Amino acid sequence: MKKFLFYLFTLGLFSNYAFSSDSIYVARYKGDKACAISYTFDDGLAEQYTLAAPQLEKRGFRGTFCVNGAKVNKDNKHITDTTRVTWTQLKEMSDKGHEITNHGWAHKNFSRFPLEEIREDIVKNDSAILANTGVMPRTFFYPNNNKKEEGKRIAVQNRVGTRTKQRSIGRKSTPRDLEKWVATLIATNDWGVGMTHGLTYGYDA
């Protein structure tokens, strides 16, 4: 959790950093910022609702939360797995401006299942997210970060994008690592994608 808060603090320092020039040009990022960073959270863990989202909102940020519908609890009264979010919570997050998107219905690794089964898994999760949040997912995050080409061709259909690169932010990350990452993004005018799972439990917490 401390690393996550430091991550947000570091980005806050750079949130007003923009290029200045007298010439007219098209800005690459909103507000002519020097770089862009997406906060992404995998697997729909409960503390992403209780800890991550509130900390983002407190600082004026919003995140992208990719979920597996098969593991999401039905609602706040029907909890079968206390480590996972509920559809009610995801709806609330969506209403507050966070993106709730597709990570596969059952987190199926693209290399281990037939393509038609992968397609059904993606479509089923899209339908569940739309039905429960009212918003159709327009991005996709690859389960296990497996980007098998045949699977990618299915996943990109009707999307504005998929997560093809990411910077893992977990227990091995240090404040110095994050500072260097942000500095590099600014220097290169790049778009960084931070990937986090659990803050206090779960993968790479």
Please provide the spans of the model-predicted regions.
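Metal-dependent polysaccharide deacetylase catalytic core of the NodB/CE4 family, i.e.
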Residues: C35-I37, E57-E150, Q157-V160, N189-G202
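A short, acidic, amphipathic alpha-helical segment used as a generic capping/interface helix at domain edges
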Residues: R176-T184
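Sec-dependent N-terminal signal peptides
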Residues: F4-F14
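Short, glycine/acidic-enriched loop or turn micro-motifs at the edges of active sites
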Residues: L45-A46, A106
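N-terminal pre-catalytic segment of deacetylase/amide-hydrolase enzymes
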Residues: K2-K3, N16-Y39, E47-L51, K58, ...
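A short acidic, amphipathic alpha-helical/loop segment
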Residues: L51-Q55, E150-I154, W181
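Acidic, His- and aromatic-enriched active-site or binding-groove loops in soluble protein domains
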Residues: R159-G170
